[in-house]
């Protein structure tokens, strides 16, 4: 089947429900980014950015009704079919900063977890091997073309050369939790020998510049002096 090419793609009303666990979600996406989801516990619409909610609105009851229908259908299919549970896939995680890292400047770490199936996962942040909960936000499960899912977890932080970070991923498809490590890359300080060589090169280049400049000045003066003698009439 050929892929459909389009400038923009909206995925409206993605409804997921699975059992056991009574886990579900209702989301809207635009160009692969989450637009909003319906909080099933609070029964309210949660916008990815508050500004989105100022431009339009969505009645959370629509999402809750979809979840109820999917739950009902799943229960019927489970009772009437000799089903085989789907295989668990091993998710893949990558950690990277949102912006170029400058020590002491606020930034955001992003943990991108792909190939999630089924859509049940724990993503936690560790700083110096200790759990971090402040400044953490994660998206809902976003659908891939192959019907697996991906999810992003964000951690706001201030880079320091004393801190190291890990994104911890736990999933049924993993034999053990996976840790994706990240720490700021600090340029190594120059050694005394390197500093001496750099200074010597700089001094040499400066001396060469002075000599070359002096030569040009002398040649210019000679050329100017010659041009002042009048030729024969």
Swiss-Prot record:
Topology feature Extracellular, residues = 1-195
**Gene label:** H2-Aa
Q: What is its main location?
A: membrane
The name under which this protein is listed is: H-2 class II histocompatibility antigen, A-R alpha chain
Regions of this protein lying in the Cytoplasmic compartment: 222-233
Species of origin reads: Mus musculus (Mouse)
Q: Ig-like C1-type domain location, by residue? A: 91-183
Pfam families for this protein: C1-set, MHC_II_alpha
Region (Alpha-2) spans which residues? 89-182
A Gene Ontology cellular component where this protein is annotated is: lysosome
Q: Which GO terms describe its molecular function?
A: peptide antigen binding
């Amino acid at each position: 089947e050929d892929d459909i090419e389009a400038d923009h793609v909206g995925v409206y009303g993605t409804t997921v429900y699975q059992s056991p666990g009574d886990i579900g979600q209702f989301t809207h996406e635009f160009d692969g980014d989450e637009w909003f989801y319906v909080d099933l516990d609070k029964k309210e619409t949660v916008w990815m950015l508050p500004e989105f909610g100022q431009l339009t609105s969505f009645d959370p009851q629509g999402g809750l009704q979809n979840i109820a229908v999917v739950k009902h259908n799943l229960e019927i299919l489970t009772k009437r079919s000799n089903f085989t549970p789907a295989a668990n896939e091993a998710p893949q995680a990558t950690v990277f900063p949102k912006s170029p890292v400058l020590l002491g400047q606020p930034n955001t770490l992003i943990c991108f977890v792909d190939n999630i199936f089924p859509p049940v996962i724990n993503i936690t942040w560790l700083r110096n091997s200790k759990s971090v909960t402040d400044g953490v936000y994660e998206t809902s499960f976003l659908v891939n073309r192959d019907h697996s899912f991906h999810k992003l977890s964000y951690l706001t932080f201030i880079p320091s050369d004393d801190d190291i970070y890990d994104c911890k991923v736990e999933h049924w498809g993993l034999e053990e939790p996976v840790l994706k490590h990240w720490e700021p890359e600090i340029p190594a300080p120059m050694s005394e020998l390197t500093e001496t060589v750099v200074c010597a090169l700089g001094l040499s280049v400066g001396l060469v510049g002075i000599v070359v400049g002096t030569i040009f000045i002398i040649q210019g003066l000679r050329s100017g002096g010659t041009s002042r003698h009048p030729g024969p009439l």
